[in-house]
Every structure is written in structure tokens, then in C-alpha cells.
Swiss-Prot record:
Cross-referenced InterPro entries: CHCH, CHCHD2/10-like
Biological processes per GO annotation: cellular response to oxidative stress; mitochondrion organization; positive regulation of mitochondrial ATP synthesis coupled electron transport; positive regulation of transcription by RNA polymerase II; regulation of cellular response to hypoxia; regulation of generation of precursor metabolites and energy
Region Disordered, annotated ranges: 1-50, 77-111
GO cellular component: mitochondrial intermembrane space; mitochondrion; nucleus
Cysteines paired by S-S bonds: C114-C144, C124-C134
Effect of mutating P2L: May influence risk for Lewy body disorders
Stimuli inducing this protein: Up-regulated by hypoxia (4% oxygen) (at protein level).
Biased composition (Low complexity): 10-26, 39-50, 100-111
Protein name: Coiled-coil-helix-coiled-coil-helix domain-containing protein 2
GO MF entries: DNA-binding transcription factor binding; sequence-specific DNA binding
Record keywords, A-Z: Activator, Disulfide bond, Mitochondrion, Neurodegeneration, Nucleus, Parkinson disease, Parkinsonism, Transcription
Effect listed in the UniProt record for changing G4R: May influence risk for Lewy body disorders
Residue span, CHCH domain: 111-151
Length: 151
């Protein structure tokens, strides 16, 4: 076994002699480098990805969107067509009539067919200082009399 002891001593000596050399020349501190980005693995990405909603959740979300859109659409439609003015039980609005003939005029016109034209001519003659300005009304009155056989 002397052989093993020799080798042991000889082996131990060289490392001891090397140690002082290393201490004499200290190494500079290593510069910190950012770690290289590891490519994403298939196992890690599935755990980090958010969970997607199921089919029923998507259908419920779509139905809610349709309901809101329908409500907004109906409200705007009623606003445009006058739904805010009183609801569906209210009477429909009557159009404004700009001209209505008096009810008593019809029998009077049957008795005197050119009464309206006469009134127009007389009103013009009273309001105008010059009768020549009322020639148009006079001409209409003459045409009415000819058409009704009164001339």
C-alpha cells in the first residue's frame, strides 16, 4: 500500500503550490448579463393563457348584446316617429289645416256663385288708392260671371 500513499502525497502537493499563484492574480468580478430569453414551451404557455369562455357563455353574451341593441333601436325609432309624445294610447296627431272654408259659404255660393270674387274685388278697391291696381280681381270676376251665365 505504499504505492497509494505516495501517489496521495504527490497529488496533494501540486494543488497546494498552485493556490498561491491564483491568489496573487485576483480575477475581476464578472459583469452581470441578462439571462437569455427562453423560448416559450408548449406546457408553460397553456398555463399562462387566459381561459376562454365556453359556448354557453358566448351565446349568453351575444343574446344580451342583441337585447340591448334591440331596445336602443326601438327607442330611437319611437323617438324619430314621435313615440315620446304620448305613447300608443294617445290619439294620432291631426295635421294642421292651413285653409278651411267657412261652412256657411257653400249655400251662399250656390245662390251667388261669384260672391268670393266680388268680395276680393271690393276689398282691393277699398284698400288701394288706385282702382287700376285691382284690374286682375275685376278680370277674375268677369270670368266667373261668364262661366256661371250671370253676365
Amino acid at each position: 500500500m505504499p504505492r497509494g500513499s505516495r501517489s496521495r502525497t504527490s497529488r496533494m502537493a501540486p494543488p497546494a503550490s498552485r493556490a498561491p499563484q491564483m491568489r496573487a492574480a485576483p480575477r475581476p468580478a464578472p459583469v452581470a448579463q441578462p439571462p437569455a430569453a427562453a423560448p416559450p414551451s408548449a406546457v408553460g404557455s397553456s398555463a399562462a393563457a387566459p381561459r376562454q369562455p365556453g359556448l354557453m357563455a358566448q351565446m349568453a353574451t351575444t343574446a344580451a348584446g342583441v337585447a340591448v341593441g334591440s331596445a336602443v333601436g326601438h327607442t330611437l325609432g319611437h323617438a324619430i316617429t314621435g313615440g315620446f309624445s304620448g305613447g300608443s294610447n294617445a290619439e294620432p296627431a291631426r295635421p294642421d289645416i292651413t285653409y278651411q272654408e267657412p261652412q256657411g259659404t257653400q249655400p251662399a255660393q250656390q245662390q251667388q256663385p261669384c260672391l268670393y270674387e266680388i268680395k276680393q274685388f271690393l276689398e282691393c278697391a277699398q284698400n288701394q288708392g288706385d282702382i287700376k291696381l285691382c284690374e286682375g280681381f275685376n278680370e277674375v270676376l268677369k270670368q266667373c260671371r261668364l262661366a256661371n251665365g250671370l253676365a
